Amino acid sequence: MSQAAGNPYAAELAAAKKAVTLAARLCQAVQKDILQSGVQSKADQSPVTVADYGSQILVSLVLKMEAPASSSFSMVAEEDSEELRKEGAEEILENITELVNETIVDDGTYSIYFSKEGILSAIDDGKSEGGPSGRHWVLDPIDGTKGFLRGDQYAIALALLDEGKVVLGVLACPNLSLGSIGNLNGGSSGDQVGALFSATIGCGAEVESLQGSPAQKISVCSIDNPVEASFFESYEGAHSLRDLTGSIAEKLGVQAPPVRIDSQAKYGALARGDGAIYLRFPHKGYREKIWDHAAGSIVVTEAGGLVTDASGNDLDFSKGRFLDLDTGIIATNKQLMPSLLKAVQDAIKEQNQAASPL
């Protein structure tokens, strides 16, 4: 049964899927140019910056055109227009404007042409602070910037908050195969590439091709023996305490090496059973942003999984732009969660004891 049947957020879901699909087209065009030109940094003039802004503008446009207007439009997103309004930013603003307009024309759905001022205004649609009341869209226009630059995994991640709760999430993963991932950077041999994950509260989770295909219901794996489990973590070592995640895996009895991929594509892969566990333990002092987890977490929970902080608390997306949580984020199926939580807490305790002076 499709999520549209009996889904109170069916119209919002359709708009969200359309929004991230259009944004993905823009991102794919830019990534192709990056790989051909050899760009490898997120400098202010770099193509990835253009793609970040362009993706956000297109998502905002489609949502405002397609999603039911319950009240004033509100979106919590990563980018604002401050840098683009500064002296010296004219060239990058010109590039963004040109790319967005080209994408809209190529798509053919909307007869809209953005001026530069219209571009700046559309970017600032994402300046909402979110919070516990009302409806707020939550967007990461390119999650996994370094993966995007390398030609690896990235995601356009969009969720809807309703009264502080995530009720809908979509993940466009242009480089993720539709088949189960088979190596350590999320690639797969021979499978069609470009996955679109979606979930609505109470209606389950699905995956379909970004190019358009019937949606298929997905569910997390049913593994209950940690020895048979594999775990996902960030590709970038700077994003993760690998000594800690390695200790957790060892205490749990996991024998497979970690599968390291960028972005919330990890949540999508976990939700369809490609692996059993996701561990995210950033370095001390890092504050998690809600757009880094809102869409991915509901895809996993609607696929039958659990997503919590290191103490087993549900993630609270109602506190504004940041998550207020304990230490890290873990996700797995219901069978493995009790033993995973114990391994996490034992490993953290051991690490803290080793770090404290005698």
Swiss-Prot record:
Record-linked Gene3D superfamilies: 3.40.190.80, Fructose-1,6-Bisphosphatase, subunit A, domain 1 (3.30.540.10)
Tissues expressing the protein: Is constitutively transcribed in both roots and shoots.
Active site: residue positions: 52, 145
SUPFAM superfamilies found in the cross-reference section: Carbohydrate phosphatase
GO molecular function, one term: 3'(2'),5'-bisphosphate nucleotidase activity
Alphabetical list of Pfam families matching this protein: Inositol_P
pH-dependence annotation: Optimum pH is 8.5.
Reaction(s) the record says it catalyses: 3'-phosphoadenylyl sulfate + H2O = adenosine 5'-phosphosulfate + phosphate; adenosine 3',5'-bisphosphate + H2O = AMP + phosphate; adenosine 2',5'-bisphosphate + H2O = AMP + phosphate
InterPro entries xrefs: DPNP, Inositol_monoP_metal-BS, Inositol_monoP_superfamily, Inositol_monophosphatase-like, Inositol_monophosphatase_CS
The family this protein is said to belong to: Belongs to the inositol monophosphatase superfamily.
Name assigned to this protein: 3'(2'),5'-bisphosphate nucleotidase
Gene giving rise to this polypeptide: RHL
